[in-house]
Amino acid sequence: MISDYDALLQFNKKPVSQEMIQFLATSTASIIKIRENNNPIQGCRPPDLSIFIKNVVIQSNVQTPTLMATSVYLNKLKSVIPKNVYGINTTRHRIFLGCLILAAKTLNDSSPWNKHWTTYTEGLLRIREVNTIERELLEYLNWDVRITTPDLIDSLSYFLGPIKEQLFLQRRQEMLLFNAPSPGQLKEYINHRRPVSHSRTSSAISVPSLTSMATVSTTDSRSSLLAKYQPSLPLVESDNFNKKNHVPLRNNNDICNNFRAEENIHSVNHIDVTMGSSPVMSHKPTIHQRLNFTRRGWSSFFKQ
């Protein structure tokens, strides 16, 4: 968030513009009313207030901080001078010149003397009148000529509002440019966003070899191959349901005799599995675990 103080510092760097002069002329005119003279003396009509301010600014070479500080004194005079008071044709010119003299002497170590300010008026005021204007303004302000930052912010709020918006947009643009990805990061991001190809030539998916493909076959297919080459075998007479081999046992001697009888039966009825040129496997083949084809991990977006 842009503060008023930052906007004020930015405003003080600007050169004096016609908008500033017109603002001061309007502020001075709102302090006191002028009673029109129906019979003005020829050659004594003062110049327009905005033209008078412009001529003084050009001849004195006053800068923006000193010039716009007069708005603080103008606001203070607005609360001091009564509303029902009327001035002469040069009253507003006198008020502005007195406020500018006070601002120049308060804010600068070295400022023009009153005789110099008299020449800046181009003959409108004399040196004695300029001295009187300065003393009267000091009495109106009770010799309180301090200019604080809150006073400037309050008096120049008309100019600070647009500057704050401009600074906000400028800093936002700078943040966007600062956080923008570099060309290398942008290229890496685009490459990571490309879809993975599933062609045979793509290296994103590992293709199993012909040897390992045999392990992917199902149990049913392997069983069908065994059934093709293995002949039907005779049943062994000594199965688990043979009553001759499974008689009730009475003691430990019977258990030992039963085990010996079973060994003799298996030795006699052993099946010879060597048959011609087509060997038959004596045990069921082991089905290996299926291969899990997984894509390579997607790269995450680049981090700022």
From Swiss-Prot:
The record's GO molecular-function terms, alphabetically, read: cyclin-dependent protein serine/threonine kinase regulator activity; protein kinase binding
- To which protein family does this belong? Belongs to the cyclin family. PCL1,2 subfamily.
Q: What is this protein called?
A: PHO85 cyclin-9
Q: Which InterPro entries match?
A: Cyclin-like_dom, Cyclin-like_sf, Cyclin_N, Cyclin_PHO80-like, PHO85_cyclin_1/2/9
How the protein assembles, per its UniProt entry? Answer: Forms a cyclin-CDK complex with PHO85.
Gene that encodes it: PCL9
| Taxonomy of the source species | Eukaryota, Fungi, Dikarya, Ascomycota, Saccharomycotina
Q: Name one GO cellular component term.
A: incipient cellular bud site
Q: Which CDD domains does its entry note?
A: CYCLIN_ScPCL1-like
